[in-house]
Structures are given as structure tokens and as C-alpha cells.
Amino acid sequence: MQNGTEDKSNIPARSNDDVLPPLAVRLTMKVMRLIFIGKMFAYSFVPFPPFKLLTFDNTVGWFVAYSAIVSIWGFAVWMERGYRHKINLLPPRCTKIRCSRCNTRIRSPNWFKYKNWLYFFLLYVSLTTSNLIIQLASFMTEMSRRGISVPGTKDPGKRDYLGLIIPMRFIGAFIHYMTANLFKEYYLHNGPLEKNDRPSTDEKTSENETL
């Protein structure tokens, strides 16, 4: 049994990095983060400016290339956000006591990376497909409004593709959300492997036994 005074010699001194920023700064950062996320999701619902510059001589290959470029841009933005989150944590650590991702990373780190990058690839293909369908549907809608015959339709003035565009925009926004969350989780669990990656039960019980 120890006396009323505790030995504080082993307690590390608080550094300047441990001090939380002022409340106004934290609120401002949260508002800016929400504005950024809202702006990113807005791109899923607002047509891109190049749509207005399209002519009726564009080929399907041009649409595919443009969709791939747009998807790369969206992917790069979320990748940069996830990497910035990783830099702020240094090194990234998961705070869950039981985490399947951490167990997979420790047991088979190569499979952890391959599995996540496979998810990234599938999300990228899904985002490119969503952008491509939106572009083609918007383009055909504009052709129908101008009275130009669309392949596979008999009445060009009565065909409207808005019923296809709106669901695809919601799907695109959901893909953006999945991509952002996957990058965050990947960087959070992809830290360097160490022996004491997680506290053992013996260490926890030894801490509880001290009175």
C-alpha cells in the first residue's frame, strides 16, 4: 500500500503537441471539413462543365476516357484526405480492442493490402461506370430535346433519360462515401507492424492490481 503521495517521476511531461487547439479553431476545422465533403458530394449531382462543350461528333471512346479521368480526380482527392489523416496520427493506430482488420493485418499483411487494393479497384471501376452512364444519358437527353434521333428510339422528342440519371447520381455519391471511408480505414490500420502492436491481457491485469 502506497502513501497518499504518488511518484510522478515516471510520468512523461506534457508537450506542446498534446495541448488541444482552442475551441474556435476546432469548430472552424469541422465546418471546413463539412463544407469540403459537401462540395465533393455536390460534384456527384451537378453536371460537369465539359458537358456544355460537347458536340454530336463525340465517340463512345471519348466518353470512356473522360469518365476515367474524372474518376481518377475524385479518387486522388479522397486518397490525399486519407493520407493527411495518416500524417496527423503518426503512426496510425486503431483504438478498437477487438478489430478484424488489425488481426488480418498482423496475421497476413500482404493479403490485407491486396484485399484493400482490390476494393479500391472495384470502387474505381464502379465510379467510372457511373460517370459514363450519367454522361451518355445526359448526352442522349440533349439529343432528344433537339429532335435528333437516338439509336434504339422511335420518338426522339418523347424520350427522357432523367429517370436513369438521378439514381446514378445517388449511386455515385454513395461510391464517393465508400471510397473516402475505405481510404480512412486503410491508412488507420496500415501502420508498421510491431511486437507490442496491442496491449496484452497480462499488462492490463498488472495495471489493475496496483492499489
UniProtKB/Swiss-Prot annotation:
The lineage of its organism: Eukaryota, Fungi, Dikarya, Ascomycota, Saccharomycotina. Residues 1-33, 80-116, 184-211 are cytoplasmic. InterPro entries: DUF4668 (IPR031427). Its main location: endoplasmic reticulum. It comes from Saccharomyces cerevisiae (strain ATCC 204508 / S288c). The chain crosses the membrane at residues 34-54, 59-79, 117-137, 163-183. GO terms for cellular component: cell periphery; endoplasmic reticulum; endoplasmic reticulum membrane. Keywords: Endoplasmic reticulum, Membrane, Transmembrane, Transmembrane helix. It is found in: Endoplasmic reticulum membrane. It is a multi-pass membrane protein. Residues 55-58, 138-162 are lumenal. This is Uncharacterized membrane protein YPR071W. The keyword Transmembrane applies. Coiled coil: none annotated.
